[in-house]
Regions:
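A surface/extracellular/periplasmic glyco- and lipid-processing/surface-interacting theme
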Residues: 34, 55-66, 70-92, 103-110, ...
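Bacterial N-terminal signal peptides that target proteins for export
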Residues: 1-11
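C-terminal motif of bacterial Sec signal peptides marking the signal peptidase cleavage site
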Residues: 19-22
């Protein structure tokens, strides 16, 4: 295998050139910014997020994996938990990883297809949540937040199962309050619905493929001022394993290049750094033993995020859980 090649990821403004590259078989992904631009149609038309073509029964909307009709129809649950010391992440279908001032924040974990007996310690609302969550219309379990962010969640009609309004869904644990999927569902208001299929999935038995992909066995990301984080591909498990504690395994890894902005929060008053997930930008998608440069776009909080390759073709991901890293400007990425 060739040595890993590093690149500097720069947050791209709306309409800027997007990452693209060609990768030869057996070579580390040669991900260079500005080699090509996604088509305008790809940037304005959301891909159809479909279930696997060969599926003969119900599938989980966020993973594409076979499940029961009852599970497929139940709502998703969103919970912020710390990455270090967090419990329940291996049961999540989607995880969003965000940074603040070079410090890794509590990740936003989305549960739908699996029951998690213990999740936590449960965190509060973050400024990015009103932009991330509406497309999933989940039940949001949280411990509260600044008045402005909570108001935006209410405006987006995101049902909240908070520690103050639904205490029966929580229990005291080491480091804070803990919850569970059954506890949140039992305390949830009526009328919650299942999320849409937010990622197009490859057909049953098919791998993540694109003509722009190259072989990948390790992925190392280094945000400015933060420790490096390495993911390693397990061919036996057909999954990507995150280094460190807790160990997590996912089918898909999306390294999404986004701007960050200082946000003034009220009640309590403080500044917070928040990922800006609306607009478009560059990304790298990793699935199976391959990685490909791509571009992402999200037109509104209610719209799902679309991912297309350098030719503007929607990516079709491997069945299973997905981890999305919201990379700040100046981050470095090495794919080997």
């Amino acid at each position: 295998m060739s040595r890993a090649k590093s690149l500097r990821l720069l947050a791209l403004p709306l309409g800027a050139a997007l990452l693209a590259a060609g990768c030869g078989g057996g070579q580390a992904a040669n991900l260079q910014p500005g080699d090509a631009t996604a088509t305008s149609a790809a940037a304005t038309t959301a891909p159809a997020a479909t279930a696997p073509a060969a599926a003969s029964g119900p599938v989980a909307p966020l993973t594409g994996l076979p499940t029961s009709a009852a599970v497929a129809a139940r709502p998703a649950i969103a919970v912020r938990v710390p990455l270090t010391g967090g419990v329940g992440l291996n049961d999540a279908d989607i995880v969003y990883q965000e940074y603040e001032h070079a410090t890794l924040l509590k990740v936003l974990a989305i549960f739908q297809s699996k029951d998690a007996a213990e999740i936590g310690p449960v965190g509060g609302v973050r400024p990015a949540d009103p932009s991330l969550l509406p497309s999933l219309h989940p039940l949001y379990a949280n411990t509260g937040g600044a008045s402005g962010t909570e108001g935006l969640l209410e405006k987006a009609a995101i049902p909240q199962v908070t520690s103050s309004s639904a205490g029966s869904a929580y229990r005291s644990g080491t480091g804070g309050l803990m919850t569970s999927t059954t506890g949140v569902l039992a305390a949830a208001p009526r009328g919650a619905k299942a999320p849409p299929a937010v990622l197009p999935m490859a057909g049953t038995g098919e791998a993540f493929t694109t003509s722009h992909a190259g072989k990948a066995r390790t992925v190392t990301i280094t945000p400015p001022g933060a420790p490096a984080e390495t993911w390693t591909y397990s061919a036996a498990g057909r999954s990507w394993l995150r280094s460190g504690t807790p160990g997590v395994a996912v089918a898909n890894l999306i390294l999404q290049n986004v701007p960050y902005k200082e946000v003034l929060l009220r009640d309590p008053d403080r500044f917070a750094q928040s990922a800006r997930v609306l607009g478009r930008g560059a990304c790298t998608a990793v699935s199976g033993g391959t990685a490909t440069p791509c571009s992402w776009y999200k037109r509104s909080a209610a719209a799902v995020t679309g991912y297309v390759d350098a030719a503007g073709v929607p990516l079709r991901f491997t069945h299973g859980p997905t981890w999305v890293v919201l990379l700040p400007p100046g981050s470095k990425l090495a794919v080997g």
